[in-house]
């Protein structure tokens, strides 16, 4: 019984402080590919240069992009690594889910 309880407790603790999202587009290539799984730390504290997860406006899903600049109130200007220009507007601090801490390159193996 212990062999089951400990891993389940560890996973519950992990997902209390972390989340996971699957990359769906190519805007972060070559850093991340469609199908890759990103684990992120649930915090609004992101720094310029970090890959982060944020909510689209009106709850339309999650986006994985790089933080280009972070303002004094935590608002973030973002950009996909494959994009030549930054995303329009800024991401309000309330929509930031957190920085990516681990990226699992699942998409690179599944697509081939």
Predicted regions, residues:
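Extended hydrophobic leader/signal-anchor segments used for secretion and membrane insertion
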Residues: 1-112
